[in-house]
Each structure stands twice: as C-alpha cells, then as structure tokens.
Regions:
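Hydrophobic anchor residue at the start of the ABC signature
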Residues: 76
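Helix N-cap at the start of a conserved alpha-helix in ABC-type nucleotide-binding domains
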Residues: 98-100
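Conserved ABC ATPase "signature" region
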Residues: 29, 33, 41-58
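Catalytic Walker B motif of ABC-type/P-loop ATPase nucleotide-binding domains
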Residues: 87-91
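ABC transporter nucleotide-binding domain
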Residues: 107-193
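Conserved ABC ATPase signature
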Residues: 62-66
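C-terminal coupling/interaction segments
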Residues: 195-243
Length: 243
C-alpha cells in the first residue's frame, strides 16, 4: 500500500533534496507539517535539530547559497523532524565535515532510541560501528556477512592490527607467521593475534629505530578491518567511498 508506506516511512535519498527558494529552517518546518506535525511543536523540533546539527549560521540562508554539507544535514533534519516508524537514510554523512558528522551520528542514534527503526546505507564503516545495532555487509549486491558489530569483529581471525607508515624505498618483513598487507606505497598493516602483541610492537619499534618505518600504531581489529578483509577493498577505497 503506497499510501501506508508514505505515512510510516521517511526517506533521505543519496541525492540532496532540491529546496530552492526555501531556507533550511523553513524546509524542515514545512516537511514536519506535511508529515502531520502540529505547527508549534514542529517549529520547535526544527529549531532543536538546527541547533543539534550546528546549522544555526545557515538556518535562514536561501538554499541556493548553502554548501553540499549543509544541504545534506538539512535533508536529514527533514526526515527526523517528524519521524515515521521506519527511517531510511542513504549515505547520510556524504559531504558533511568531520565535526558535524559526529553530531549527525548522535542524532541518528537518538532516532533509533526514540523508537524508529533506522535503516541506513553507508561506506563510512568506522563511524557506523559506533552507532548501529546490527549491520549487513554487501559485496556487489550479495550479502556476505551480517550480525552485530561486536559479533562480526569477534569472528575475525585476529584480535589486533598493526598499522605502519613505511619509509619510501625501504623493504620490511614482518615477524614469521604474520602477514603484511600493503594498502598503498606508504601504508601497510599486519594482523596480530592477542598472544603476539608484544612481539609485534618490539618488531615495529626496532623497524622505527632502524628507519624502515616512520610510525606505527597497534589497535584492536575494527569493523572497517573486517569489511576490508571480506570485500577485498583497500582501506583507501573505503575512505574514498566515505569522503
């Protein structure tokens, strides 16, 4: 039933919503009223979203003069002002600066906590890991993994990853039994089991003193690492999709 779907569902498309002739505040308020919100409550909610997403500077700026990031945040707020039982967000963080991306993820989490089912599509795996309850990883349209972030990370073969910035022109060999993955000319990583972290750090510290690498960082395996291993995408490709 298309009419029922429209009542129960809010959608933020990947392409920005054309709101030429309106301001962000007016557009958010107008959509809230079209969704059945009471005028006074809708206006208050629109103003709350403007403040929560740090859009006050552009609240009354004509849409044709705002940036792509502000337009993206406005489109999200138009979905969130009077949310339905299902909220669908397609790449909601595209074009959004790092500071406001954090604010946006907070608002997405609040939508879910308030009772809406939130279905979101994103390549920003590292940020999504902190906000989602469950996820499905797709590769060329096929489901290759699904579950909670913790379960997917726990199912990974290694517990830690050693990120390395290589010195140009220098060759490095990881400790025996550890495999090095080259991401680009300067960056590589080594998967490390929990019982070999000391050995991995000692090896990296020696390589740093020897000038073979410029820096290193040992961190727990992230959902992004799982995504890269499952899909075969490089970390740089993941970051490029998320930019």
């Amino acid at each position: 039933d298309p009419a029922l779907a429209r009542r129960l569902t809010n959608v933020q498309a990947q392409a920005n919503v054309p709101i030429t002739g309106l301001t962000p505040l007016t557009a958010i308020d107008l959509v809230g009223r079209l969704r059945g919100g009471r005028p006074r409550q809708t206006r208050r909610r629109a103003e709350e979203l403007i403040e929560a997403l740090d859009l006050g500077e552009w609240a009354t700026t004509p849409a044709q003069k705002i940036s792509g990031g502000v337009a993206r945040l406005t489109a999200f707020a138009m979905c969130a002002v009077v949310p339905g039982r299902l909220v669908i967000l397609d790449e909601p963080t595209n074009d959004v600066d790092p500071v406001r991306r954090r604010l946006l993820w907070d608002q997405i989490r609040l939508l879910a906590d308030a009772g809406s089912a939130v279905l979101l599509v994103t390549h920003n795996v590292r940020e999504a890991e902190r906000a989602v309850d469950r996820l499905t990883i797709l590769d060329h349209g096929h489901v290759i993994a699904e579950g909670t972030p913790a379960a997917l990370v726990a199912g990974h073969g290694s517990s830690f990853v050693l990120e390395i910035s290589r010195t140009p022109g220098r060759r490095i060999e990881p400790p025996a039994g550890m495999s090095l993955t080259q991401h680009d000319a300067a960056r590589a990583s080594v998967a490390v089991d929990s019982h070999r972290t000391t050995q991995a750090v000692e090896w990296a510290a020696h390589a740093l003193r020897d000038g073979a690498i410029e820096r290193y960082e040992l961190a727990p395996i992230s959902l992004e690492d799982v995504y890269v291993d499952l899909t075969g995408s490089t970390g740089e490709e993941v970051r490029r999709h998320a930019a």
